[in-house]
Structure formats: structure tokens, C-alpha cells
Amino acid sequence: MKIYSWGSGNLGQLGIGNTDDSVSTPTLVLPPDGKKDYEIVNDIVGGGCHSMMIIDNGDLYTFGSNDSGQLGINSNEQQQQQQQQQQQQQQQQQQQQQQQQYQTIPTILNYFKINSIKIKNCSGGWAHSLACDNNGNIYSWGSNSHGQLGIDTTCSLNSTLSTSNNKNNNNNNNNNNNNNNNNNNNNNNNNNNNNNSGGVIKKKIVLKKKKVERKNLNEPKLIEILFNNKIRIVSVSCGMRHSIALSSENDVYGWGCNKFGQLSNLIDGNSLKSNNNNNNINDIADPMVQDSPKLINFKNEIKIIQISCGFQHTLLLDINFKNVLSFGQNKFGQLGNGNFIDQSNPCVIDISSFILPTSTSKSLNDIKIKEIQCGWSNSCLLTNQDKLYICGRGEYGILGDNRDLSLDNSNSNQFKLLNSESFNENKIKNFSIGSEHILIQVYSNDNNNNNNNNNNIYSFGWNEHYQLGLCEPIIIGKDGDNKSFPQLLPSIKGNDKSLVKAGGGNSFFILP
């Protein structure tokens, strides 16, 4: 099995051993053990500037940026790897500082290996990571700036009352150069206070805002509240700074940033029992943040089968594969509900509102959604007819509607069919949306496999870092040209088991 990557690699997130900012040609990602090929790779996912790869035996590899600990490799392991990688003392000293911030090759996450934990699926946010093991336990690590790890890492929480005689006292403390003027003002104010209150100086109460400081984690840690409540998780998804998990009971749990309603307004604060009496203290300090997992309570009216997080929005698919629920930021219409208003109340979108039956379907009842995915500001649905529908941001050409990008940057607040001649005689086998670009592998309708387009790979959208893989010559200082229409990748072709995977500003291809 071979792995290819291309696009942005300035922090090693391509896994090809360097920090090239732009790679336009699909390049082999060599196994870290020196072997020629990988045995079996189950999945590759991309975060903001880091990547994660799951091997068939359950091992997890990470590479790319580690500025917040999102690779899950602690400092001792890093130092050992740095010493092995460097041959000269001067190079070693330089690289020790750099390698603490990134890894350029896939590096096994020893925490799971040592503890015999087998990883089933994973997801990367802007600077945090989640992984789910075969037993339904979730582990998190990296940035916890907005509670996105689901673990209380608070190291200080200050809430005090202070008093001052008048508003000039604060100025006295802050402006040493104006002490004389402030003292005169203080005297005048004190005289006024004495005249107005019979000689009693009134004290002004100043409430200092609660300050919550959360530590990052540079090593995976079990989210105990889910484990203690015997919640078995089957899949996870990371947004920029929020996290969503799906349980084996088809319930959804969310935590982290909720500024735009990306956790919804159905968060049930009493859904999980905690051994920590102060479990909700941070949630009270900042209502925009949920530090621990909470049930998104649909009151048994809706059960969910798939989850996906965008940058600041969330998409869910119901267990009947018929309805999509969306909530969170909607600045670009990424919720697909017909407007551009942020929504904390989940919008239920019936596919009958935008999907029409084709000659292969007798009625609308035959059509179902088999996969949902979110980009940063877009949402995608793939139907059982192998048709792709996209909504959200129109800039960079990610809607694939062949618009003139110099004239039209309009957004779409409704799901629209990706209509391309490339797909008229072919169906979409698999697809992946990254931050602002999409990769698609097609297969032929020709049962005899006489179609030369079978297993071709296409890409469109944002191409600043040449993540579309079109093999263009790279000119230093010049960005790649964005594409609003599916482009054929000239250097690679898939097979019946290959997969495309899009990351933040990069792309991967798994070729068995």
C-alpha cells in the first residue's frame, strides 16, 4: 500500500520529511520503519496544520505542527528522536528547537502502543486531536483553549471583589507620571464626597471578571466522564475549537467552543454524572464554553448515524439517512437552511427540498444520504445515487459550479448538485472535503470497465498551496490558481479500494 501527499507542508504535515510550503505533485509518504510500502492504512485525517494516520493494527501515527501538543508526543520522546535524527552537533542543537514544534515524518504515538490501545478512528481540530479506541473510549490532547479536550485542565480561576474610594485611584496605580494631577483630583473628589455624604467616603465596588486558564495536553488523556458513565463512543469529529462524539446508542455529545451555537442550544447540563463537584464551574465562568462533554438532547425524537464538524458549525445525519441537522455559524450559508443567520437551534433539512429523483430511482423515497462531510465553511452530502451536493462559501471555487472567480464570490445557502461533464458517465466513488478544497474519485457506469475515466481523481477549490495536485510548476512567491470546476489529476489514478483524503491545505491519497 502506498500513501501520497501534496499541498501545504510548511510544518511537516505532508509527512514527506521536509517543510516545503507548497508541493504540487503527489509525493510518496515513506513508512517510518524503512519499509518500501505500508501494510494497510485505514485512514488519514488532517487538522489545522497536523495530520493523523491509523494503521490496520490500531497504531496511530501523527506528524506536522506540535505547537500546542496536538501530535501527542511528549518532550522526552521528541528529544530521543531528535538525537537519533541528527548527525552533527550543530545541526542537532538547531533541530532540537525546531522539532519541538513539528514532525516531518509519521511518528508513532507511543502512549497507545505502550498501553495496548487500538485506535479505531480519529479527528484533528485546529490545534487539538481526538481518538476513539476499539472499546469506545475517547482520548484527547493538544490545545484546550476553549475546553475542546473535554477534560478539566484549569490551572487558575480568579473571582474577587475589590473596592476603591473613587475612580482616580486606579489612575494613580497605572499612571505614575501623572501622580501630582491625580492627587489633586483625589483631593477634590474626596472633598465632594465629604460634602455629599456627611464626611463618609463611599467605596465603589469593582467586580473582576472570572479568568479561566486552561492547560494544553501534550499526551493523550482519557475523557473520564464518558468512561465513568459507560458511554461507548463509535466516532469523533473536531471543529476548529469544538468537539462532537457519536455514541453506540446513536446519541450525540458535544463540548468546547459554543460561540456560534456549534454545540446547539440543546446541551443538557445534567446528562452526565461527574465525580468532580466543580465539574460545571468553568461552564459558568464562560457560557460560550463547555469544558466537559454534554448530551445534545433530542429527547429520543431523533437518533443520529453520522457526525461531521466544520470550522464553527456542525452537521448530523439521522438514523434513517433522510434528514440532515445543522447548527452553528451560517455566515456563508454552510447550514444549508436557506438563510445566512447563525443557528443554535438545530435546523432539520429534508432532502426532498433539494433532491429530485433520477431515472434510476422510482421515487424520492428511494433516495438516501449515505455520507456527510464539512469543510471549514461548507457542507457536503453524498447520496446513494452517488451524487454530491454542496452548500456554503463560494469563494475559491469550492462549490464546483464553473463560475468566473474574478467576478463571482457569492455563497450558496442551499445544497446544490455538483454538475460536471466529468461525472455524466461516471459516479462518485468517494470524496473528501478539506478546509476549502474537494477531492473526488469516480468509477465508471460501464459494467465492462471500458471507460478510461474509471478511478480517475478530480479536485477543485482553493489552490494557494497547490493542494489540488495538478503538477503545476511552482513559482516562489506565487500562489496556485484556484479552480471552480473539477480538474483531472494527471499523475495518479485510483483502484477499487483507493481513497482520497483532504486536509487543511493539503491532500492525501491511499492506494492499496
Swiss-Prot record:
Do you know which Pfam families this protein is assigned to?
Answer: RCC1, RCC1_2, WD40_RLD
The answer on whether this UniProt entry bears the keyword Repeat reads yes
RCC1 repeats span: 1-56, 58-134, 135-185, 197-248, 249-319, 321-384, 386-443, 454-512
Q: What is this protein called?
A: RCC1 domain-containing protein DDB_G0279253
Q: Organism, per UniProt? A: Dictyostelium discoideum (Social amoeba)
* Positions with biased composition (Polar residues): 66-77
Residue ranges of the region described as Disordered: 66-85, 162-200
Q: Where does the record place Low complexity bias?
A: 162-196
InterPro entries xref list: RCC1/BLIP-II (IPR009091), Reg_chr_condens (IPR000408), Ub_ligase/GEF_domain (IPR051210)
What keywords appear on the UniProt entry?
A: Repeat
Decide whether keyword Oxidoreductase is in the record. Answer: no
